[in-house]
């Protein structure tokens, strides 16, 4: 069985129509559709999965307008080892039910806090197999969370135009737990500081764009400052989150990132090409981390 089941020709026509109307490529519409089908199946499972990261900003909040192929998942409580094993089995089972194959089985270990599943699927629009990446991270609890509807290009197009498509598409209506905008904002600020300390900029400048888009939705107030301190305490535990250590001053580090143009080349060469809107590097900085750097919300108060 493949993701399009017995409806290959119908799916092809639907995706071509949506692609022409919303000015995004068929491959992007196709991948978004499969992501939604995956999340729909995941939403039926009892374990407390939480959808987070950049793709959630697009599919749950309709906030960003860039290409994102990853689905980032976590949980809102600590898992037992048995549940971790079950998680691995569930994700692979869902993928296989959609005709996808796991490319890196030897690199996925249920005992690990972080795993990257690389699945491939047969595309209607490409002779080459295409990838969908599912990332799971269980080293931190996810909070705050809320129930949100998960959108898709096909589902949104049908809803906006009052169209009923001639194929089953239950994934047009998906509701699941999603990490809050505030927490995603906090995580992304810490992430760009972590990568700066680790001298890693390749493909990480996308966070600058996301922060720029998140900031108008975020209040830089005492409530956010409290959340930042709580998240920082959690992040301190992991060696993979160096900027959470108290020896680092986040506002000053953001100023260094700006003055050193640390992410500029990657933003121009990679991130800007993934955007469906015109936001250049300077705008992303000036309307994003430059504003955060002038604020005191990331000053640790405990």
Task: Label each residue range with its predicted role.
Residues 51-55:
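Glycine-rich beta-strand-to-loop/alpha-helix junction loops that act as flexible
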Residues 1-49, 59-65, 76-302:
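Structured mid-to-C-terminal alpha-helical surface segments
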């Amino acid at each position: 069985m493949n993701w399009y089941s017995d409806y290959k020709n119908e799916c092809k026509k639907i995706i071509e129509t949506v692609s022409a109307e919303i000015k995004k490529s068929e491959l992007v519409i196709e991948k978004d559709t499969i992501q939604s089908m995956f999340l729909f199946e995941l939403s039926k499972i009892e374990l407390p999965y939480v959808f987070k990261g950049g793709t959630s900003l697009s599919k749950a909040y309709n906030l960003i307008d860039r290409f994102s192929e990853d689905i980032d998942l976590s949980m809102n409580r600590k898992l037992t080892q048995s549940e971790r094993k079950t998680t691995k089995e569930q994700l692979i089972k869902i993928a296989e039910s959609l005709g996808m194959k796991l490319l890196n089985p030897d690199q996925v270990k249920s005992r690990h806090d972080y795993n990257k599943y690389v699945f491939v699927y047969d595309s209607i629009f490409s002779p080459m197999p295409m990838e969908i990446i599912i990332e799971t991270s269980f080293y931190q609890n996810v909070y705050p969370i809320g129930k949100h509807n998960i959108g898709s290009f096909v589902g949104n197009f049908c809803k906006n135009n009052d169209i009923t498509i001639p194929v089953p598409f239950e994934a047009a209506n998906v509701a699941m737990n999603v990490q809050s905008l505030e927490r995603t904002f906090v995580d992304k600020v810490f992430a760009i500081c972590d990568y700066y300390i680790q001298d890693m900029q390749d493909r990480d400048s996308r966070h600058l764009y996301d922060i720029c888009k998140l900031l108008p939705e975020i209040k830089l107030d005492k409530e956010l400052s409290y959340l930042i301190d709580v998240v920082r305490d959690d992040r301190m535990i992991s060696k993979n989150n160096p900027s959470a250590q108290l020896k680092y001053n986040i506002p000053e580090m953001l100023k260094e990132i700006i003055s050193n143009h640390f992410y500029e080349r990657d933003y121009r060469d990679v991130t800007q090409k993934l955007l469906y809107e015109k936001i250049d590097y300077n705008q992303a900085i000036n309307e994003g981390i430059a504003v955060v750097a002038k604020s005191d919300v990331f000053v640790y108060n405990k």
